């Protein structure tokens, strides 16, 4: 099977993506826009129940300073999951359908910065697997 995904590195009307039945993965900038995605909890609930996957773009790219920490980014994901759970989404379903990625593309970044971003992303992924 080939999954179909969409990425939006800004804010949008997320119902556009959640209501398209052929979209399997929604990749969003969780670092910059998680608070706005939470506003679409009902749409996300339906999306996840039909097997949709949320890809949390948690490691910043253009705004990457090098001061970001694994603990801080994992806390942001935990806080996001808690916010969505309070809005009625099933925590287990969120965790079963969770991917992580950089917040946006790395095409304009140098190799050194890109490598640091992917190292941090790996650390976030490993921490989530252990703690959530």
Residue ranges of predicted features:
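Short beta-strand/loop segments at the ligand-binding rim of alpha/beta enzyme cores
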Residues: 1-7
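Residues that line or immediately flank small-molecule/substrate-binding pockets and catalytic motifs
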Residues: 8-11, 30
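Catalytic-face loop-and-helix region of soluble metabolic enzyme cores
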Residues: 21-131
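Distinct, well-ordered alpha-helical segments
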Residues: 10-21, 44
């Amino acid at each position: 099977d080939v999954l179909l995904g969409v990425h939006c590195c800004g804010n949008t009307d997320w119902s556009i993506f959640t209501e398209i039945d052929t979209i399997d993965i929604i990749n969003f900038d969780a670092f910059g826009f998680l608070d706005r995605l939470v506003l679409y909890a009902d749409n996300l609930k339906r999306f996840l129940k039909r097997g949709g996957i949320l890809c949390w773009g948690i490691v910043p790219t253009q705004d990457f300073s090098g001061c970001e920490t694994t603990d801080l980014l994992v806390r942001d994901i935990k806080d996001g999951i808690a916010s969505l759970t309070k809005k009625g989404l099933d925590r287990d379903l969120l965790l079963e359908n969770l991917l992580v990625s950089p917040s946006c593309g790395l095409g304009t970044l140098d190799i050194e910065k890109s490598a640091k971003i992917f190292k941090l992303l790996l650390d976030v992924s490993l921490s989530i697997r252990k703690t959530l």
